[in-house]
Amino acid sequence: MLKPYFWISAGALACTLFTTNLIAAEGADKAIVKDEHRDIGVGKQTAATHTQHPDAQWYPDAGLGLFIHWGIASVKAMNISWPMIPGRALAQKRITDPAERERIIREGDYDLKGKPNPITPNQYWEMAKDFNPQKYDPDKWLKAAKAAGFEYIVLTTRHHEGFALWPSAHGNFDTKNYMDGKDLLMPYVEACRKNGLKVGFYYSPPNWYFEKDFKNFMYGGGAKKNPEFPALDADLKPRTNTHTAAELAAHQQAYDEMVRGQITELLTRYGKIDLLWFDGKPPTPHGSKCITQEEIRKLQPGIVINPRLHGHGDFVTYERTLGTDKPVTGWAEFCNTWTAYWPHVDNAPFRAPGFVLGQFTKSRSLGVNYLLGVGPTREGEFVDGIYQNMAIVGDWMKQNGVAVKGTKPLPSTESASVPATALSHARYLFAAPSFRNGGSYEDDLLPAQDEILTLKGISRPTQIQLLRDGSALKYSYSDGAVTIELPASKRTKLVDVVQVKL
């Protein structure tokens, strides 16, 4: 049974400060995502149309997905891929003093912290030698995910770092070179099917290991703002090697063949795959044309494809911030993390369940799926915090799932003061908790207030109740609008759902 998580009512705090800080935090997230997407080749995304294959029509009503980031970064419980790339500070500051540029190059201080980057690409890739998970049990993960109400799973088969979680015949940095060729994907696929979950593969066409002799490992925004700095090699030293045009062309052809070959393996070795989640495109002349969506659908006719490789796909993706305030007309997904990180990072606190459920219900009110990110440890385990938070979400879903599963945004003739969904003759209003200063953790929760909810453009309700326990709520109705009283005494730290029957 869902623990009440009841608040103690308190006086109102300044809403303006909260809103201002929330906007500032979202603005910072947007800037980071924009810079990273530019570096990996994610451009404008469209989903004007989507596949009509009957096997793909599960997607818009799926609601809740689990995004699992796993790779060699788990060896040191650090963020994935991006820590090897210095120069974010240089993306914000133009260095015009030649002496200061020389100092930065000499000391490797590309993040302007008075010290070199904590890890070089070569040091990062060395973690592959120590990546050999002995407690990998995806069935345990996904049994808990299913009980929590998740409908589909997406696992990183290969991130930008370049390490593939299966023994690939293409490229030279995967489990065939390490772990005696152990395949980490097949147990995951089997566990998805066993637990009735849709199978999703994340795949990054950018492969920094494959590109290590050619790539500038300076953060793209930093290199763009400060073009006087040299390109950096895999030791984060000024790159000294050069390549002929023929060598570059041969590398680019091999790169395209590697990406095409690995995607083909993912779509032919593991049976039916429900979703393919790309993240960028190869830095080659052919780029997104290394494999077409038509070729992908010949291998997997019912697959759902995101637009981050080809620029168009079956659904648009919003990352870190929900990029719309209006109901979407096509398919869409919002992905964010349960902690501050995509993979497992030691001692990273989990965002409050009320925050996560607030983002989930806001997404569903707009017709958007919510893809929530977690990561296993180096041994292949979920930490207790994941299971504990899944249990809270699962209990909430048992009582309130009808408000988010199979529901749609409100009809265009209706509006509400809070996020809301519609299903037949019922409407569901979501009263989410508030957080101070744009925060998202338990310590940021603000005390509950009495709240007035409004729903306009409807006929006279036949019943209004708190969905979790069926208790009646006071309301008034006039001129097609209902005003509902939700007292602080009935609020919880989670999202409180009000059911309006018409």
Language-model segment annotations:
Residues 9-21:
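Bacterial N-terminal signal peptides
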Residues 25-502:
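Mature catalytic domains of secreted/periplasmic carbohydrate-active enzymes
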Residues 1-11:
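Bacterial N-terminal signal peptides that target proteins for export
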Residues 4, 14-15, 393:
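Intrinsically disordered, low-complexity Ser/Thr- and Pro-rich stretches
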